[in-house]
């Protein structure tokens, strides 16, 4: 079957060239349908030799929906002033370049956090940067869930008190492990945490920043506040100041 026959006929479908490369290299066997469509990306269900996969596609038209994306990109090396200008102008070239940068950065963060022992979806391309570049704006990672469906986000669940506390403690440990690894998620809440087999899985990392980023501490404090607020809906009462001290004390 040709690569274009595996791809849905829609504006935000995975790009044919990148999917062809993933097929030829044996990373991907098939795309079966859409899992989720958001402002920044669409996620499709794929099949690989090692099982189900999430095929996340950053769309150039959607890059504009990242609020203050320059804030997160600060300090990231691009090396081409023309590309920087195109991104700043939001031209077609700039939007495409930005989609590629978000995808490459998410791959880098997935590999880094996996090595640090943080529960994230296993990246299925890389860590070689040339392979990641070939994948373009497509992030291929292990699917969290099973044949019956994807793992739910914590924001979509109503947990029993004991489960809610266990999930919160797990999420705080993950946040602390990221900080020790030199990473701040920068969009951390129950909306970006999956609950699978009684464990938290951290997702959505394109906006993650280095711990030496000029606004890292502010972004970390915001992450902690968001985590405490969204877990408040599950009945967990945790003072953000205490949680922040716990996260940064290790």
Segments predicted by a language model, with ranges:
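C-lobe/activation-segment region of protein kinase-like
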Residues: 160-167, 179-185, 196-250
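Conserved ATP-binding subdomain of kinase catalytic cores across diverse folds
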Residues: 8, 15-150, 176, 180-181
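Catalytic-loop signature of eukaryotic-like protein kinases
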Residues: 187, 191-193
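AlphaC helix of the protein kinase catalytic domain
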Residues: 149-160
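Residue-level "edge-of-site" marker
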Residues: 126-127, 191, 244
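Intrinsically disordered, low-complexity regulatory segments that flank or precede the catalytic domain
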Residues: 1-7
